[in-house]
């Protein structure tokens, strides 16, 4: 596996990617088909990441239905520190051994995990972790969390709760909804102990229990505080009400962090392609904006995607102005340019309030 580092947008840190050789990719793709045939029947319904026919919007829709159906008053927002780098090979192979009887399949997975990484001209052994970038890595991550988190929650913890609860997970990103505050606090404490058994660490600074639901805003106001919000899959979720004010609504907006990162990434791309001919440049710009709207254009986020398109047009104006004599591109000329190469309209594409 060849390890390369890519910059994390908006951060000085870098993310390691493990890129397997072409032959290994073919073998891994075959292993994925075999393992999926077994584990798709085992995975819990509320595991949405990297599974056939499921995606981020399904997880967001499940969260919306759960919170707005009533009985949810607390949310646990959780974060696992460096999950992919801390998967313990011994535990993963034990988990696989529960369902996979073919020793050849297990040997292939073991070889992939122990293949080592080629970095800076040297081969280094890999004693733990599953490299991000591998074809099979997302599935192995799901299997690891299925045994270390999902089964513990569904078969043990949830049965001891005094009220309703629901865990919604997308890969290593998950939130848990609770009716009772003591259940939420207890989960927060026991989660750390549970994941610690399998070499995983809860990021304490990013894991919190927050009051949420129909009465959270009024209670916060009575205390002179702002209502709490939480982030999940790039969106900030907050307490609100319907237009007539009669019913509670959970609404969402592109998170500030993701918004900054997306704009910074776009700005860096523009800088790198500032000499690209306008027709070719705008073809890619339109595709990028369309992709952003396809993901973030969800119920209640009109403001978020509208602001993104507005900021993209401002960056375009700035960089196109730098091509020639500074100030040569007037606003009038730029408007004509956008008529010739229009940006996608910021319309809501995904309804999170309706069943799929």
Language model feature labels by segment:
Residues 1-356:
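Non-catalytic terminal/accessory segments
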């Amino acid at each position: 596996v060849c390890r390369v580092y890519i910059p994390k947008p908006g951060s000085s840190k870098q993310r390691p990617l493990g890129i397997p050789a072409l032959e290994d990719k073919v073998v891994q793709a075959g292993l994925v088909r075999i393992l999926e045939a077994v584990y798709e029947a085992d995975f819990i319904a509320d595991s949405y990441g990297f599974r056939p026919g499921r995606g981020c919007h399904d997880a967001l829709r499940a969260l919306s239905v759960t919170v707005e159906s009533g009985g949810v008053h607390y949310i646990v927002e959780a974060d696992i520190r460096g999950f992919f780098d801390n998967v313990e090979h011994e535990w993963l192979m034990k988990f696989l051994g529960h369902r996979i009887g073919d020793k050849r399949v297990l040997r292939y997975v073991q070889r992939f995990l122990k293949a080592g990484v080629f970095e800076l001209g040297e081969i280094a052994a890999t004693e733990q972790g599953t490299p991000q970038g591998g074809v099979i890595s997302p599935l192995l991550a799901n299997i690891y969390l299925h045994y270390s988190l999902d089964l513990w929650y569904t078969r043990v913890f949830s049965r001891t709760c005094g009220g309703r609860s629901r865990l919604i997970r997308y890969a290593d990103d998950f939130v848990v909804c609770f009716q009772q505050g003591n259940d939420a606090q207890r989960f927060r404490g026991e989660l750390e102990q549970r994941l610690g058994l399998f070499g995983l660490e809860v990021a304490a600074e990013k894991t919190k229990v927050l009051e949420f639901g129909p009465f959270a805003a009024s209670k916060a106001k009575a205390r002179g505080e702002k209502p709490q919000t939480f982030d999940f899959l790039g969106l900030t979720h907050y307490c609100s009400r319907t237009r007539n004010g009669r019913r509670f609504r959970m609404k969402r907006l592109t998170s500030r962090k993701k918004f900054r990162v997306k704009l910074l990434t776009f700005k860096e791309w523009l800088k790198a392609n500032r000499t690209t001919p306008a027709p070719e440049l705008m073809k890619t710009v339109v595709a990028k904006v369309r992709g952003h709207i396809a993901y973030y254009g969800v119920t209640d986020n009109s403001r978020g995607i509208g602001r993104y398109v507005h900021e993209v047009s401002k960056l375009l104006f700035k960089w196109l102005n730098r091509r020639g004599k500074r100030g040569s591109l007037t606003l009038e000329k730029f408007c004509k340019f956008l008529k010739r190469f229009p940006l996608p309209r910021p319309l809501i594409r995904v309804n999170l309030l309706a069943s799929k």
